[in-house]
């Protein structure tokens, strides 16, 4: 289950755009071996709101493109498909029958800015940011160079499989 909450008014959000991002999320989960019903919240915000959230949660007082708030714990350098192969969850990890993976907070305003900066489509940039965030929800990180390489490789593999290119 993907819950979408549009909390901004600067960018128009069509059903087609929302449906596309939901499909991207579902595909990324499948590619990462999430084989049980799960729940992700996808929040659309503007630069000001993501700046506030970034400041409150990370003490970084600037806008960013996407924030990820995973609900599951992962050992260092481990991801979902390495840790939860036996679907070994506690009851607290669920909302009804759905495993709660976490929240994605996406600045659509920043996604548009970056699409122009990187000279590709707005849809491609939003798709990339959503895949990036899903991977964070599943334990991927990019603080260390080896982790960054691993995460970037998975992002590109997933986007390429979806035929989403620069």
From Swiss-Prot:
One of its GO terms (cellular component) is cytoplasm. SUPFAM superfamilies: Metalloproteases ('zincins'), catalytic domain (SSF55486). Its EC number is 3.1.-.-. Binds 1 zinc ion. GO terms for molecular function: metalloendopeptidase activity; RNA endonuclease activity; zinc ion binding. Its main location: cytoplasm. It is found in: Cytoplasm. Coiled coil: none annotated. The keyword Zinc applies. The keyword Disulfide bond does not apply. Its cofactor is Zn(2+). Zn(2+) binds at residues 132, 136, 142. Belongs to the endoribonuclease YbeY family. This is Endoribonuclease YbeY.
């Amino acid at each position: 289950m993907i819950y979408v909450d549009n909390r901004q008014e600067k960018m128009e959000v069509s059903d087609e755009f929302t449906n596309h991002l939901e499909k991207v999320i579902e595909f990324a989960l499948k590619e990462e071996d999430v084989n049980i019903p799960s729940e992700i919240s996808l929040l659309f915000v503007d630069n000001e709101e993501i700046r506030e959230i970034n400041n409150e949660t990370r003490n970084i007082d600037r806008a960013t493109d996407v924030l990820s708030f995973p609900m599951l714990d992962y050992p260092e350098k481990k991801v979902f498909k390495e840790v939860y192969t036996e679907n070994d969850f506690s009851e607290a990890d669920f909302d009804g029958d759905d495993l709660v993976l976490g929240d994605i907070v996406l600045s659509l305003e920043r996604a548009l800015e970056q699409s122009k900066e990187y000279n590709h489509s707005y849809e491609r940039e939003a798709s990339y940011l959503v895949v990036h965030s899903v991977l964070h929800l599943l334990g991927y990180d990019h603080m260390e160079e080896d982790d960054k390489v691993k995460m970037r490789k998975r992002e590109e593999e997933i986007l390429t499989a979806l035929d989403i290119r620069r």
